[in-house]
Every structure is written in structure tokens, then in C-alpha cells.
């Protein structure tokens, strides 16, 4: 078992390093690689969600292909809209896809059509929309130029993941050392207040480094972003734990050796991304 634990640790480490390298590389390389990567991630995560609820939720049978296409298309549509390559007409096929999801249940004679609707729509709101909103972070309209020019700023979407990774790592280390008070025992027995606060401090600390190198936001705006990401990331993590608890599964999938599934890896970002978008819009209103 000692050997097994070690090989599992090595497997986890290799997967973790590759995962971070691919994510960081694709976000930084070009807006095109960013788009391709997250269309694939959206599709895989939604497919995994569909597989999970089909296997584990009573009488549920969602159309994995359609919800997967929906998530991928929503990402593309929001991207096209954000880079000014398309106007709002680009969302019409998506609306038709949602209508198809509703109407098809009339004819499919499945066991539990209402739950199929519910889980299908949830896949779009809970997974499709947050990933699509990454485009709002990544692309910026420059109204000052006479041509409508859109610039790609990889640092904002990347910073979300940096804050989440650092806060996770910090929470794990600090929680293991001094964690006494349980954060949310009913849903996630391992998390401690000490770990979560420690992880938050690590992430906010890193925001000062980002503020130094990328001064398009002030130090306090960066720190606020880190705080929002950490708090909502924790809720995102707990939300997915609640989902898995209700479905009686330990991991959402097996695609990542030693790391469970796609949902396990992106659970915290699914709430952190929309929260970050709202926070950054709020800064422009103040």
C-alpha cells in the first residue's frame, strides 16, 4: 500500500503539472488557443456531468450530445460576440437548441422528462455559462480608438486560476498543519476554517505581485478580485461536493489520473468566474 500511495502521488503530480502547463500555455499563447482549449473543456465537463446524472440520478436520461454541443456553442457565441465578430443574432441557434431540449422530451417517452429538462438546463447554467463568461474577462473593447478594436488580455482569465490554485494549495498545507475548526462539515468534512483563511491570505498575497507587474488595475482592485475569487471558489467547491453527495459518488469522473474528473478540477472556477465578472463590472460602475 506504501508503494501504491507513492505511485498515486507521482501520478497526481504528473497530471497536475501537465494540467497547469496546458492551461497556462493555451491561455497565454493566443486568443485562438484560449478559445479552442475552453471549448474542449466546456464540452468535456458537460459531457461528464451528463454521464454522471444519467448513471447516478434516478430515472434521469439526458441527451449528452446535445447538452455538450450547447455548451461548446455558447462559448463560441459569447466569444464571437465579445470580439465583435458577430452581433446578437449569433445566439439564435443556441435558443433553438434550448427549445429542442424542451420539445424533444414530449416525444421521447422517457421515464422522467421533467428531471431531464432540469438537469439539461442545469448543465448549461452551471457549466456552460461560467466557461462562456471567461470571454468577458479575456476580451476588452477599446472605445478610445476610432476603429472598434478588441484586445485579448490573457492575464485576467489566468489570474482566476492562479488565485484558485494558490488558495487550494495554501488551504491544503495550512489546514493539514493547524486545521481544527470545520468549515462545512455536513458537505465537506475535510475543509477547515484555518485552511480556507490561510489559502485566502496566500491568494491575496499573490495579487500584490500581479498588481506590480500588471498595473491595469490598482493594488486594492487586484486584492478585491483575489478575495472574490477565493470566497466564491470555496462556494463552488462546496456546491460540487453537495452534487456528488446527493448522487453518492466520490469523483465526478476518471479522465484525469489521480485527480478525478473535469468537474472536480473546475468546480471552484464555475462560481469564481461569474463572481469575478460581476466584481469587475462593479468596479466600472463605481
Briefly describe each language-model feature range.
Residues 171-172, 176-177, 241-249:
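Juxtamembrane interface at the ends
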Amino acid at each position: 500500500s506504501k508503494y501504491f500511495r507513492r505511485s498515486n502521488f507521482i501520478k497526481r503530480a504528473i497530471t497536475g503539472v501537465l494540467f497547469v502547463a496546458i492551461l497556462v500555455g493555451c491561455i497565454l499563447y493566443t486568443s485562438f488557443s484560449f478559445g479552442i482549449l475552453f471549448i474542449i473543456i466546456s464540452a468535456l465537463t458537460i459531457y461528464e456531468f451528463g454521464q454522471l446524472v444519467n448513471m447516478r440520478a434516478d430515472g434521469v436520461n439526458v441527451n449528452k450530445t446535445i447538452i455538450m454541443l450547447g455548451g461548446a456553442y455558447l462559448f463560441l457565441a459569447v466569444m464571437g460576440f465579445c470580439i465583435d465578430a458577430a452581433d446578437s443574432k449569433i445566439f439564435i441557434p443556441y435558443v433553438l437548441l434550448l427549445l429542442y431540449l424542451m420539445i424533444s422530451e414530449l416525444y421521447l417517452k422517457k421515464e422522467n422528462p421533467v428531471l431531464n429538462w432540469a438537469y439539461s438546463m442545469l448543465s448549461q447554467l452551471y457549466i456552460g455559462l461560467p466557461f462562456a463568461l471567461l470571454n468577458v474577462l479575456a476580451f476588452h473593447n477599446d472605445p478610445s480608438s476610432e476603429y472598434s478594436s478588441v484586445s485579448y488580455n490573457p492575464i485576467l482569465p489566468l489570474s482566476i486560476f492562479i488565485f484558485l490554485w494558490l488558495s487550494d494549495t495554501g488551504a491544503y498545507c495550512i489546514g493539514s498543519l493547524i486545521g481544527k475548526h470545520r468549515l462545512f462539515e455536513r458537505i465537506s468534512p475535510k475543509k477547515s476554517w484555518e485552511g480556507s483563511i490561510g489559502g485566502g491570505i496566500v491568494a491575496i498575497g499573490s495579487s500584490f505581485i500581479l498588481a506590480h507587474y500588471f498595473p491595469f488595475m490598482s493594488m486594492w482592485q487586484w486584492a478585491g478580485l483575489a478575495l472574490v475569487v477565493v470566497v466564491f471558489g470555496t462556494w463552488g467547491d462546496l456546491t460540487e461536493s453537495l452534487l456528488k453527495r446527493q448522487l453518492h459518488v466520490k469523483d465526478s469522473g476518471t479522465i484525469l489520473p489521480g485527480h478525478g474528473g473535469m468537474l472536480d478540477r473546475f468546480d471552484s472556477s464555475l462560481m469564481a468566474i461569474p463572481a469575478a465578472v460581476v466584481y469587475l463590472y462593479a468596479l466600472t460602475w463605481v
